[in-house]
Amino acid sequence: MPKTIVRHLAYLFYLGVLILPILVLDHEEALIRPFRDQLSSYIALIALNILLLEFFLSGRIRFLSRHLGLDWVLQTHQLFARVALAFLVIHPFIYSLPNHPNHSPGPATSEYLGMNGAGLISGIAALIALIAIVALALGREEAKMRYETWRFTHMLLAVIVSALGLYHVLAVGFYIQQHTLQIYYLSLGILAALSLAWTYILKPLTQSREAYAITKIENITSQQFLLTIKKLSGSLPQIQPGQYLWLKYGSSKPYPENPFSIALVNHEQKEMSLLIKVVGDFTAQLQQARIGERIYIDAAYGDFAQHALNSEKPIVMIAGGIGLAPFLSVLSKAKEIAFKNKIHFIYGNRLEDQIIDIAKLIQLADLKSLTIETIVSEPTAAYTGLCGMIDLNNIQTSLQKAQLNPKECLFFICGPSAMIDATEAALEQLAVPLAQIDAEKFQYNLAAHTPRTQATLARCIIGTLLIIAVSVWRSLS
């Protein structure tokens, strides 16, 4: 089944799960409250549902990342976190019923709200923590926050928000008094906690028994190195070209841990290599590691370029800097299966000395159909390739030199988020259908005017409007 259809079906299923609580509650009991109070309670229940489901859309469930792609999973995670925040900010102002008198507090009824004491405080605290989560996620780069610090803070705040939110709903909610909804939310909360425990407690314990050892560290350029690791016992996990892993250095404890694309795999030697750029403390420590030191991994994730070598269309790979890494595994697989289709590789860097000689890492003699075009934004006088950014003009020039019609090609893009956005915008101007473009990002600039961003926002807006429409319908019917 085509990936696009799978993603559409998955999205419909996700929306169905979101509205499930307001569909299963006892509607006869719901009709005894005013419309506004019903609507407010409904969107609050859906918001809590979103927050608990976020634990399963963090990108750490291998099945989802392999079949739906990291791009889809993280987009859904990030966008619907904002939907939940909007619902939770709005819902207190929709209520029309008064609160219980101070001299006679009590649970929510058909005539009064139950916003008193710990129930009220927990709701306010959960909302503040959720605002902090979204703010840190949006402003991490501007604040120059270390990735490991942000991940730990994000996880900790998510636990706080979910626990306080669940307590708030159980303490002051009107419809949550129904046994069916209590079971649903408590079960979902337990499953969310178990998913967290699996990722950060149980999985590290299993990783400690499946260690890897560093066998080689090769400096490829001044800021990029190839880290080769070997599994000490057993065989390598199943790895497809273009996938990535989570890596820990020195210890299997939950933190620090970082994602890296898998560049090369040698199943016979039980080795894999990662192309890494030094951008912070963690990668700098890896570059200075000693041969034989232990590495612990969680692999493999993602579906980037999974179907690149199954198509009859010409393949165009566009990499910015360290975005070369996943393409090395794709090219290695293409060589292994004697791939005959045209492959055109566009490789951009800021400086010439940052260009990696792919032929030194992969024997490309068998890939007769491969052509490589380099682009340098700050060239020296001796440089003879294309100059500037990976933009419309350079992409068009490169494709013309390779005698390729962009409308007939499949495009795979990897690199910094801004570079991916710019490349997708350029391909839109070349009339390349979005279905022929594959890119995988960890962060998203929703202000970028690209076909993918517009489609993502449209999907989220339509889904949100559908949720609101169902909530209104249930409140009125």
Language-model segments: residues:
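Reductase modules of NAD(P)H-dependent flavoproteins
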Residues: 2-13, 17-19, 97, 159, ...
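Short, conserved phosphate/pyrophosphate- and ester-handling motifs at nucleotide-, phospho-/glycolipid
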Residues: 77, 154, 242, 323, ...
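Hydrophobic alpha-helical transmembrane segments in integral membrane proteins
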Residues: 173, 177, 197-213, 256, ...
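Ferredoxin-reductase
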Residues: 206-296, 312-314, 349-351, 362, ...
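A short, basic/flexible loop-to-alpha-helix module at the beginning of a structural domain
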Residues: 300-311
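Conserved beta-strand elements of the Class I
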Residues: 314-318, 410-412
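Histidine-anchored nucleotide/phosphate-binding helix
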Residues: 324-338
